[in-house]
Amino acid sequence: MWYSIRNNQRMALIKQGYKILAEYRLVQDHLKNIYAIPSYASGLHWFGVIFVHSGIYAGSMFRFSILLPENFPDDTILPTVIFNAAIFHPHICPHSKSLDLGPCFKEWRKDQHHIWHLLRYIQAVFADPEGSICTGKSPSGDLVVLDEVNNLEALNMLAKSRPEYIKRIQELAISSRRHMYDKPMIEDPHYIIVEPYCAERHLRFMEQLKSPSWREATCEDDSPPAELLGHIDSSRQLDEDEANQRGKLQAATTDLQHGARCSVAQ
């Protein structure tokens, strides 16, 4: 009995690890200008960084962490997204630096949601902050704005004094670039490090791309990269993306679970 319980726990951990790895594969495949990777210490703690190239927040670089619940992805509890630095935004708490996921997610559903959905939402709130605080239109045609957000000061300034809001965000962008090359806050081999451009290293890398061995290693998937997703697209495109990603996730999970069974058998 004791051995059976231990074996079941081990199997559950292995399956969870492979599911998280499958999620990481989808993240690599789906988005640009936002990056996330599980930490070396725990698959439930992800490091992330976003480079904003359009909208009010253009020119900013923000680091963040994603904390997954213990029973991810089976738990309905939402993951937690926490930024490393304070960011002035209606959906980001000025004290905890956490992002409100409520406007897009009510609960986590493993058959519908994936980590790349979180990253896409993060891109959306920075690309279109005005759109992220609107819930629809009134019968008269006026936009209906959320009345409960993580940062009421940011909400009021964005709604009533947009020029002042933009000025504040421009200062934030300058500050974020100033800290772009800061040393890692945590000692983890998977922490995302940004380094200044080095011409010599760039030329060396470009030469490597020309080598036959490199082309052979990278020709497995010749599909075009996903375009930058600066905002939530139409429901039709979301449905197409979802169907495509579900197929890839199912294939990846099947292969990885086969590997998990082999590991337990050994």
UniProtKB/Swiss-Prot annotation:
Residues 216-266 are annotated as: Disordered. It comes from the Eukaryota. Coiled coil: none annotated. SUPFAM superfamilies: UBC-like (SSF54495). Signal peptide: none annotated. It holds the Pfam family UQ_con. Residues 15-178 form the UBC core domain. SMART domains: UBCc (SM00212). Belongs to the ubiquitin-conjugating enzyme family. FTS subfamily. This is Protein crossbronx-like.
